[in-house]
Amino acid sequence: MGAARSPPSAVPGPLLGLLLLLLGVLAPGGASLRLLDHRALVCSQPGLNCTVKNSTCLDDSWIHPRNLTPSSPKDLQIQLHFAHTQQGDLFPVAHIEWTLQTDASILYLEGAELSVLQLNTNERLCVRFEFLSKLRHHHRRWRFTFSHFVVDPDQEYEVTVHHLPKPIPDGDPNHQSKNFLVPDCEHARMKVTTPCMSSGSLWDPNITVETLEAHQLRVSFTLWNESTHYQILLTSFPHMENHSCFEHMHHIPAPRPEEFHQRSNVTLTLRNLKGCCRHQVQIQPFFSSCLNDCLRHSATVSCPEMPDTPEPIPDYMPLWVYWFITGISILLVGSVILLIVCMTWRLAGPGSEKYSDDTKYTDGLPAADLIPPPLKPRKVWIIYSADHPLYVDVVLKFAQFLLTACGTEVALDLLEEQAISEAGVMTWVGRQKQEMVESNSKIIVLCSRGTRAKWQALLGRGAPVRLRCDHGKPVGDLFTAAMNMILPDFKRPACFGTYVVCYFSEVSCDGDVPDLFGAAPRYPLMDRFEEVYFRIQDLEMFQPGRMHRVGELSGDNYLRSPGGRQLRAALDRFRDWQVRCPDWFECENLYSADDQDAPSLDEEVFEEPLLPPGTGIVKRAPLVREPGSQACLAIDPLVGEEGGAAVAKLEPHLQPRGQPAPQPLHTLVLAAEEGALVAAVEPGPLADGAAVRLALAGEGEACPLLGSPGAGRNSVLFLPVDPEDSPLGSSTPMASPDLLPEDVREHLEGLMLSLFEQSLSCQAQGGCSRPAMVLTDPHTPYEEEQRQSVQSDQGYISRSSPQPPEGLTEMEEEEEEEQDPGKPALPLSPEDLESLRSLQRQLLFRQLQKNSGWDTMGSESEGPSA
């Protein structure tokens, strides 16, 4: 690569102008890291097969660490070289060169990773050398070079070379880093590069300034080969002074291509001031590569020098001239003394009051001209870090104060979560920034503890930060996304005016402001909020001869508004929380090591426990059990007052095994006027003895009335209210047994007496066999219909117990008959006898419903009574 040629002294010709125009069009619009494509990327050497690949700066050896890793590079050197692209453009590149250490670690060297970090934008680009063969000792040092990283003028980079595989987290580092500063476009070699040429490094405007008559200046300069507008800045100064006495600005539209490299003449009119004679003229271009930050060229016009040729004084002066000069001097002195005496008398006389009033009126006239500038509706975008729920509340109250007290529209992520969810985080952030730039609005950056930590993590100098509030929000951490979006603006000083850097002095400090905003002014809130408001309005607080003030926003006057008082209350709450919990930020960081034991304000202040301590939500499943031989059921039929279908409620109570006891069955029969029967079947308490169960008798089934081994039966007796109603076709409950005829009641009492005597005789003999009386139920179909009705309702009555099938009942009865017949029966208590009597009465009432079976029942009942 040859040395750079010096630029020609003469003005470039038309052919060179067209070439420079083409280079300006092809030049990139913004500075960014990239690789040069002038030749293929080659890293192979004799004895080594190697390829160069683009890398993501994250090698897989960090995920899968190796036991044996190579040592670090040696003699890392970085130099500035220049290279041409395929289109012939000249770009500055970073020439990186390093060597390997002569130890056995080269046997485990699999490659190298080159990383270039641009410090002002935090942009990184990586390239990986992948060795396809193992390195061997060849009696000299292995040396590698790479010259494809394109750098920009006046930028600083950090170059790092990693040997692969990378070491384990606790191992010694095997990389080497160096900083590299690229010179600006004033450098002789950098001046002829494509990036510098596109920003006008070779442009020589050759400014000439001529002073014309009638207080005018003629400015002439040479245009550059880019169609862009120019601006002429004229500043005039008094002789031998530095403060300006006149300023003027003149815009020149973009020239046509045929006017490139031609002279442009502009005539400027000066103010008629005799002492304002020294002028400074500046030409500011607006090239596409640098916009309003391009280099300015200036020229100065000095004050004209007066000739020092004094007039010759005559040697002889007449005497009368002396007397004339003396007289004039006396008159002047006398006039001055007289004027002083008159002024003193007038001020002390009666007319002084009037003069004073006139003076006040005269002094008050200029005050009428001091009209405050009109305020415009503005919009701001607030960028902040959600450090804590209380700090988020402070930001919300600050936004509310801007809306209500200042009339300023606010763009805040907390107020536009739906729009962020629909458009996406980066799309919404880019849209807000574009809107702020187009409307010439301001972006307020609220700095806090989290902004400093996130900025350090963004630079790679601190631990990663993940706050609870960011984790809880649907959109996540918007501060990091916003910082990535606004970072390129801080390469251009002209963009600094868009950003207003603030921090709440009550809960934050000046050290929480990231280094990125070091060149921007910092405003502690709410002490200097008045200045922030003037920044939002694009007004200067201090101007020549006047000072703008907003009394409602100065000092502590913001507390007069409701929004200001709410903001102060939010600041006090957060400050008190910081005093109570000094390590609050570490507790809010989810990446902190002791996060498990840290208390959270979400649980203490904003949330209440849903369940008492030590309890939880328990899911219980019902356990369905079939009534067995040890089960007991008691039936209590009740009569409803309203019409409707019959509803049966069955609740089985299982008797614990090993505690059998005889339990009499009881049945309650109640009558209703009109309506359906509502029957509730509930288990009765058991004492000890054999259990009983519920079964429905079929036609021809023998049902024993006494004896503990037998199965007990509950029967529901339906008695018709009207004796004329047919018992077979009526489903209405029957009346009380007191309504029966006298002979029927006497027959029933005799039957019960005979049964009682039989039971007593069985006790006297030490045991009794099964009763001989068998009741035949001719109304089995009707009972079967009742049973089917009860079973059909079980699907709708959740608490009904399933009924055992008839076959199972008969099998159980046969098994009970096979038991020991010689087992003596236990004595009956008076309560058992009363229950038995009630049962027999129910059976009799059922038989009375059936006219056809009365004679048979009577003959069979007389037998056992005898």
From Swiss-Prot:
Residues 33-320 are extracellular. This is Interleukin-17 receptor A. Glycans are attached at residues 49, 54, 67, 206, 225, 242, 265. Glycosylated. One of its GO terms (molecular function) is signaling receptor binding. Residues 1-32 form the signal peptide. The chain crosses the membrane at residues 321-341. Forms heterodimers with IL17RC; the heterodimer binds IL17A and IL17F homodimers as well as the heterodimer formed by IL17A and IL17F. Forms complexes with 2:1 binding stoichiometry: two receptor chains for one interleukin molecule. IL17A homodimer preferentially drives the formation of IL17RA-IL17RC heterodimeric receptor complex, whereas IL17F homodimer forms predominantly complexes with IL17RC homodimer. (Microbial infection) Interacts with SARS coronavirus-2/SARS-CoV-2 virus protein ORF8. Residues 717-736, 773-840 are annotated as: Disordered. Receptor for IL17A and IL17F, major effector cytokines of innate and adaptive immune system involved in antimicrobial host defense and maintenance of tissue integrity. Receptor for IL17A. Receptor for IL17F. Binds to IL17A with higher affinity than to IL17F. Binds IL17A and IL17F homodimers as part of a heterodimeric complex with IL17RC. Also binds heterodimers formed by IL17A and IL17F as part of a heterodimeric complex with IL17RC. Gene3D superfamilies: 3.40.50.11530, Interleukin-17 receptor A/B, fibronectin-III-like domain 1, Interleukin-17 receptor A/B, fibronectin-III-like domain 2. Disulfide bonds join 43-50, 57-126, 185-196, 245-276, 277-303, 290-294. Keywords: Adaptive immunity, Cell membrane, Disulfide bond, Glycoprotein, Host-virus interaction, Immunity, Inflammatory response, Innate immunity, Membrane, Phosphoprotein, Receptor, Secreted, Signal, Transmembrane, Transmembrane helix. Widely expressed. Residues 377-534 form the SEFIR domain. It holds the Pfam family SEFIR. The keyword Nucleotidyltransferase does not apply. Residues 342-866 are cytoplasmic. GO terms for cellular component: extracellular region; plasma membrane. Residues 788-801 have a biased composition (Polar residues). Residues 809-819 have a biased composition (Acidic residues). The modification Phosphoserine is found at residues 708, 736.
